[in-house]
Each structure stands twice: as structure tokens, then as C-alpha cells.
């Protein structure tokens, strides 16, 4: 990516952070990531050996984790937010992240860190057409040339730009990129006890 120079510095920084979270941190949830940051390995937790000030600091950090968990409503999957300014190339960045996941998922199919399908939300139906850039741009600008054939042969795009458009994805299929607006997504029950999270993420390692 740095050799080709197609991505801008904010895109490169965000992508490197994404890879770091996936490969070094092991694809943690936000709560787990914060827990590691607040309580690094080796942090003394023995009450008898801590000062009152240290105990108060630990208490405050634990309260932060509890508040974070409440805010996230106990989400059991990574839910990171990458905030980039307008015009910095968020669409291309999303595509790069998706391609990275798909390529690694192909090489390591049992590794649950890497997604095998992607769902891209647009804030409104008018934005969906602009997201076709994910499909149309030159993949070799963001991935090594030897992987472009794999992507062009296996990617399946689904644009749900109309209310009447139905999603037709084969159960168990991989490398689907579904682009829709938030109003369009309807989670179908797969069982009497299913909920939205279970439907979107039935088995984490298969995503």
C-alpha cells in the first residue's frame, strides 16, 4: 500500500490500525480492548499491596468498563468506529478493509478474526449508488496484484437500493458484499429464540 501510494495518509493510518486490531490484538470487542488498555498485563490487583489512591483508580476504571458495557448493550462482536473527515476516501477505505478480510479468510478459513461476508450500511438510498465505487475501482491499487484475480472471481455484490429489492444470498456462501440503507435491513427469524444479533452473526467464525 505504501509503495503504490494510492491511499492517502488518513486512509493508511486507519487501515494499519484495523490490521493491528485484527492481527495483534486478536479482533477484540471494544470492552475487551478497553480492559486491556486500562489493565495491562502485569497490573497489580492485590488489594493488600495497593495504596488507597491505587484502589480508587482501579475502582474508577472498573466503573468505566461497566458504563461502556452498558452503552454497548453487551455486544458480543467487535464494533469499532473509524472517524474520517469528509473527502478522505471512506468508501475506498471500507473496500480495502473488506478485501483484506476476504483474502485472509480464504487463506485461513478457520480463523474467526477474518470476515467472509460484509454488510455496508448507507445513511440513505441516495448514497447507495456512490458506494458502487467499491466494485468499480482498480483493486490492485490497494492489494497485491496476485490477489486481484481471486477477488474479481469470487466477489458477489448486492445493492438493495429499492424497497422492493430482495436479498438473494445462498446460505453458507462467502465473499458477499451487501450494500443497503438502514431502513431496508429486515432481520428474519431463524428460530423461535432468534434475535437480531444472532441472525446477523449466527456463528462468529463463519463471518
Segments predicted by a language model, with ranges:
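RecA-like P-loop NTPase motor core of helicase/translocase proteins
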Residues: 1-207
